[in-house]
């Protein structure tokens, strides 16, 4: 009852706060990710969500995972657990490795991981200009892993001034310090951007410990340093050359699993990206040529002075992954209403992995995995034609041919018609296929299988979107259905107890997304969403097919509400409520049998306020999370944060 009163009060107060200055952008936004060239929401049938820099600025105490969790169809498990805990991104209920993360359109992977998905903790939020979430199967333009969709992180670039300095400084609960600064500028044919960020927190005790006494339990903190630099050259008016480098390193502490505290378990994770992006104007066409090198390194050391589980004494694991990515594509109008995107990309990856441990049963030293044997490459050729007719009919038709060094070739396609009626009602349908290639670990590790095929998916979605006159509101209703076959499964023979990865399972997910954004009182904005997601796997058990719900740690129902606006010219205030439904989790008994667990639903209420002065050059802010102190669980056996607050200042000169 207390929670309901607090939430109702927040909504009523926020309604009274909204007045005067207009700070909202056009609701018919322009996106880049959907077609690889700028296009309005009303002119594409794809389902895209935009998070602007203004929205990110009004999330001063949040990290990337928390911002993503407030979007329709997104759930990031671990977003509100210990700040340094791993974050699992679930888009429309799909597996973590079925959502592709890109930075400025470049796909990012961690070849050393079992699923090869990139760790979003390595992406500082301060250097992000905007985020475009492209839902549905997108392998035609983006290749492997884009089964559920693509999250494109677009970094901040140069300033229009010769010299511009911006940054932020904040402090909050758990002794959390966050500082960042950037120097950007542009003059004549040259522009530059240099950014640095530091983030440190004591964190919380990651595991819900039932063994260690309170005074012995430790907090599992982490710190992060991030650096980014780029320069842009325009030797002629039709060409831009932009080399860049990004580096991020995390150091933190871990616990020894669910309900088990650990005092001496440390990890480091760092990521280095270096590359160059080139753009050339050729008449009305634009040619993009880019290269990116990505290196990830992870180390885990458990030097157990006192074993918390009575088994482990010492362990050390080192995992290094390297990825080369090159792409060239051209965007050109072929007729008044038709735009063609065509290109090719090349991906090459390898990994080194070593592990050593000592337990009560003695040392364990599996053979190290070397980049000389754990490597793969693939090349793709793709094309997509976009029609934007004057009568309101829009369509995209595309395909990709991909060749992989191990399994051979595969083909994917997309068909995406939509119709815009009277500039207000958009009806859309998407039919597309997608794939995920086997990872290096699944192919070549001790459990590897070189005969694995890629996971293959067919996605269907359809719906309607409404654009109110005078930019007053936008609303969208979407149904999606995703069928994946040849799902890679970790199989253990019940007779020999030998384990190997095989293609076996079928996965089917479907759901509904309802979203609306309403503008009122000039600057007032209300955003609401509701999502329902269901998913079932079909697998072989005792020689028979069996089907059951398997969206572990993912809610069937989510609800979000955000209200915000300006009070006068300088003060902004807003509030957010997120309701997460029941979830399933699993644990293991003493005989290593799976045991199902039900996680209770929960509601989180947050509030944000900022005050601007010196012509918006300085903004002080306060960001409150979980105001009611809700107790809940994201992962069985692990803690979540209670009420936490952050205060700070943004500056821009």
Each language-model region and where it sits:
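N-terminal periplasmic "start-of-domain" segments of outer-membrane beta-barrel proteins
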Residues: 29-57, 88
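N-terminal periplasmic accessory domains that precede
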Residues: 64-67, 87-90, 102, 118-123, ...
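Extracytoplasmic beta-strand/coil segments of soluble accessory domains associated
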Residues: 65, 69-107
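Short acidic/polar hinge/loop motifs at secondary-structure boundaries
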Residues: 107-135
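Gram-negative outer-membrane beta-barrel transporters
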Residues: 388-392, 481-483, 503-588, 628, ...
